[in-house]
């Protein structure tokens, strides 16, 4: 029976959500390729998109512009669709340093990476879900446009097993090795199998606690069970099971032979070219590196950096479009680009950055020219692969507006909150004026955000406010994600009342306690004072019923004019709706713990660091290490990778000191 998308929520669509849902669904059903949802801050865009997915019943790819945002969307969508496959597909590197060469200093930087096992599992879970069911939503970062193995090969190499099927046990073991599973009878983990007489246990790459137990009777599969890998408890009897490859870069043996021949051919051509041009060092370098890789591929079926040979492994011609996650979706699927004003330019930029770095490696003999084909999609290729797209943003960019002139608006907030009124005040005397406004807000137990243009001005203003007795903090680019979360939490808790920063547009700054946003130097045109940036900044005051924005400027620039008019337009729509329906705006009541998933991040490292490792007894140190390791794994499971990375660093320090 085909599974359907179904939303589980205590809420029903409110305000202009029903109209937005209806228009988007109508557009998709009538075959529109591109649509724009202009959703003001706090209007419930994710809920609207969830309802659209439920209505159109199509597999959906939701693209976010960074891992943090992808994690937030994944959590929200998982809550709305608990009975469907909501998957997470982001880069699986906790830390990634691509290989690079700096000719000026003759420095080669080896690729260095730490793969997060949990994310790797989630990636496998995402791709296998697409082949097993239709009710799939994958939340991905923009890195999903990077090359992945061939979906046909991935599908064809699935090991399909049924009860009663005739199959020799050793044949199954060979098939598992072909799809990159390793035999390990002692350390049984993801991507391995173990053998005990007539029983084969397989730990699929997409699971983290369950394994599949295959029991043979002679040359026949007698029984298939799903088992807890740790306790051995039988969880379910299965009639059929599909074991997906343990790597996205899998290749059949016969294809591997052809690929190796083609790589050797390319190497010979490249060596001739380099030697003819007198580049003897480069020629020696490329020969040594490539021959080593070829030997590994012959013996082991893979090598480090095998993705650089992906063009040969998939037998594609030079310059051909690489396979990506988009190719794993069926033809009729939906893409939702969240915060499209940032995501779209990011997709555009990825190809050029990647090619510039790889070209240097090719020129200096570190890689064969075919490595240039292991790349992200160009923007045109991305466009070709998309079926139907919804661009979602509070401030859609020029590209989205050009592609879909008819914009679907979602302006009304379910809470009745209005876009804030805007005052324009002269720059002369701005600090004294601002001080008076801050004191008014402090008296009402409300908070203030101030955005400046330069680091120096932020620092000077912070120092001045501290000198006059204001509790203030300063947010800048060097503040790590975890500290940033802690600062936002302290602002909400009232440990300080004013937050000063340059770019206050990043996610996580929707703080209901903020009733004043002050924009200094609002008339200095630039990317931080463009119409989009100004509208986004103004939105920071739209979570509080007393929200207000003050722009300090001596003239009204074009960007200011557009932002002010747009805010007024939205406010009048919201006021009319509230009046008609008798709604009184109410500040969002949001528990402080809701702002961040890692609230403990602010507290717990202090308890860990309170006793220096040197003063701990051996037992205390072991206990602390065990506790931290458990918490690190929990944080990674909860997709709170910043917290997990911080704990990893603390653990390394603790072990080093011990």
From Swiss-Prot:
GO terms for molecular function: ATP binding; ATP hydrolysis activity; DNA binding; excinuclease ABC activity. Residues 622-657 form the UVR domain. It comes from the Bacteria. It holds the Pfam family UvrB_inter. Residues 430-596 form the Helicase C-terminal domain. SUPFAM superfamilies: C-terminal UvrC-binding domain of UvrB (SSF46600), P-loop containing nucleoside triphosphate hydrolases (SSF52540). GO terms for biological process: nucleotide-excision repair; SOS response. It is found in: Cytoplasm. SMART domains: DEXDc, HELICc. One of its GO terms (cellular component) is cytoplasm. The keyword Chaperone does not apply. CDD domains: DEXHc_UvrB, SF2_C_UvrB. The UvrABC repair system catalyzes the recognition and processing of DNA lesions. A damage recognition complex composed of 2 UvrA and 2 UvrB subunits scans DNA for abnormalities. Upon binding of the UvrA(2)B(2) complex to a putative damaged site, the DNA wraps around one UvrB monomer. DNA wrap is dependent on ATP binding by UvrB and probably causes local melting of the DNA helix, facilitating insertion of UvrB beta-hairpin between the DNA strands. Then UvrB probes one DNA strand for the presence of a lesion. This is UvrABC system protein B.
